[in-house]
A protein has these predicted regions:
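Conserved P-loop
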Residues: 1-72, 116-127, 140, 168-187
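Sensor-1/coupling segment of RecA-like P-loop NTPase cores
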Residues: 101-123
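Short recognition patches in nucleic-acid-associated and regulatory proteins
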Residues: 141-167
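Walker B catalytic acidic pair
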Residues: 84-86, 112-113
């Protein structure tokens, strides 16, 4: 029986690299996979899943208004569907992914952030915690210590930012942080 999987972690935890390696394993075994990413993430170009370690692969784009079931279409012969940057999906789109799992018996493996720079769940993350069959944390360490990073610190011109739009393109940088150092950043 297929499942809906959610792999989540802080910034820099190799989520995209893990997705690409998993998809490669399927393909090396002769299995057909579909790769998707959110239209919101265009850091490496549109329709590309890319890792900071230098590996990338083309992917289909899921727009905010897309019906995922219609976008994917016929799943005959598909062994697995991979979705990167799933935190940017809507709750309805996550529900549609669960429909594919339940109705077509095709596993869907989603990768993304758990929370934004404010420490709040993204809409897609929240829906995945409600609907996924399996949750797996991809761990990384805090930028300031050796503790596990669970938060994402946004900085602008080297100063911590806790307000503003959730999706920010420009001069902002993000750092994986443990809760203790995340909170200390604002003191």
């Amino acid at each position: 029986m297929a499942k809906l999987y959610y792999y989540y972690g802080a910034m820099g935890s190799s989520k995209s690299a893990t997705l690409l390696m998993s998809a490669h394993t399927y393909e090396r075994q002769g299995k057909k996979v579909l790769l998707f990413t959110s239209s919101v993430d265009d850091r490496f170009g549109t329709g590309v899943i890319a890792s900071r370690v230098g590996i990338d692969k083309d992917a289909e784009i899921i727009g905010r208004n897309d019906n995922v079931v219609e976008l994917i279409g016929d799943t005959t012969g598909i062994s697995c569907i991979f979705v990167d940057e799933c935190q940017f999906l809507t709750g309805e789109q996550v529900m549609q992914l669960s429909d594919i799992v339940d109705n077509d018996n095709v596993p869907v493996i989603c990768y993304g952030l758990k929370t934004d720079f404010k420490g709040e769940l993204f809409e897609g993350s929240e829906a995945l915690f409600e609907l996924a069959d399996s949750f797996n944390e991809i761990k990384t360490t805090c930028s300031m210590c050796e503790s596990k990073a669970t938060m994402n610190l946004r900085t602008n011109n080297g100063k911590p930012v806790k307000t503003g739009n959730v999706i920010q393109i420009g001069d902002d940088e993000y750092f994986p942080m443990c809760r203790k150092h995340y909170k200390k950043s604002f003191l």
